[in-house]
Amino acid sequence: MLLIGVAGTELTAQERDWLQHDAVAGVVLFKRNFASRQQVTDLSAAIRAAAPRPQLICVDQEGGRVQRFREGYSDLPPLQDIGALYATDPQQALALAERHAWLMASEVRASGLDLSFAPVVDLGRGNRAIGNRAFSEDPQVVAAFTAAYVRGMHSVGMAATLKHFPGHGTVLEDTHVDTAIDPRALDELRAQDLVPFQAGIAAGADAVMMAHVIYPQIAPEPAGYSPRWIQDILRGELGFRGVVFSDDIGMAASHSAGGVPARVHAHLDAGCDVVLVCHPELVDEALHAVQGRSLNTAALLGLIGRGALGWDGLLADARHGDTQTRLLETLGRTV
């Protein structure tokens, strides 16, 4: 299955045709798709109306610098700001993370989307792409926050996606623009980077997004192209039974597999359930690539959002304003 990107704030005729394709599981929205709260709500409805089957509509609404929808939405702080509170008051910090998750997820669901790809459970160890998106450099601290964040998302009826497996935080390179190689052995990764993923799986996380990082001591290809990582370690060793997403095949580090068809097939052959094709100019080629493949069409049904309030109901809910106030009082910033 594919999650695709669309070009603008309204669907084009070509994009409506794409949504008819059996392999299209849904759409990932970005800043380019956002003009206002009402517009993105209308776009979500248009996507569903254009497709003959349920569509999974997604966004990256983590907070901090990775927040695609801003005007009309809470200005969510980065996870690192919450993580910094853990040293002085762990219980308050974890409660705040759960509230952050509730606020983020409730606003995304009120806009007609199903999920935000969250939480980031990479360790905060200097990676250019991760930075303050991570809670902490300490695996046990990140593990505790991961469980809290999953609970907060689930309380709104949003599925939780752990990313980026098996851990993107220790390499320096940004896989959007560079190849990234992590030379560590599997035992070290088990003791460090895998710890938050184990906690998230135990907390009932619904999906995992793979990293485009290469771990040559474990497998020669990026993790998202690796049956060793997906089938043997994630599913076999860690017991994960949910949905496995690739990261975007438009990222530079994904090009090692070859052209667009080769990238799509490499992800699916390795065990990914869903391949992200976020750049609209790659969608036609990706759709041609999956013709004739057996696709796991049932995998995504459990990720469809449940129980949205709608914006009127959400703004009338005392928890919305109270959560904004708690974040403001605790972190000293307007949300």
Swiss-Prot record:
Q: Name one GO molecular function term.
A: beta-N-acetylhexosaminidase activity
Pathway in which this enzyme or protein is active? Cell wall biogenesis; peptidoglycan recycling
A GO cellular component entry from the record: cytoplasm
The biological processes this protein is annotated with in GO are: carbohydrate metabolic process; cell division; cell wall organization; peptidoglycan biosynthetic process; peptidoglycan turnover; regulation of cell shape
The places in or outside the cell where this protein is found are: Cytoplasm
Which Pfam families is this protein grouped with? Glyco_hydro_3
Regarding protein family, the annotation reads:
Belongs to the glycosyl hydrolase 3 family. NagZ subfamily.
Quote the protein name from its UniProt record. Answer: Beta-hexosaminidase
What organism is listed for this UniProt entry? Stenotrophomonas maltophilia (strain K279a)
Lineage of the species this protein comes from: Bacteria, Pseudomonadati, Pseudomonadota, Gammaproteobacteria, Lysobacterales
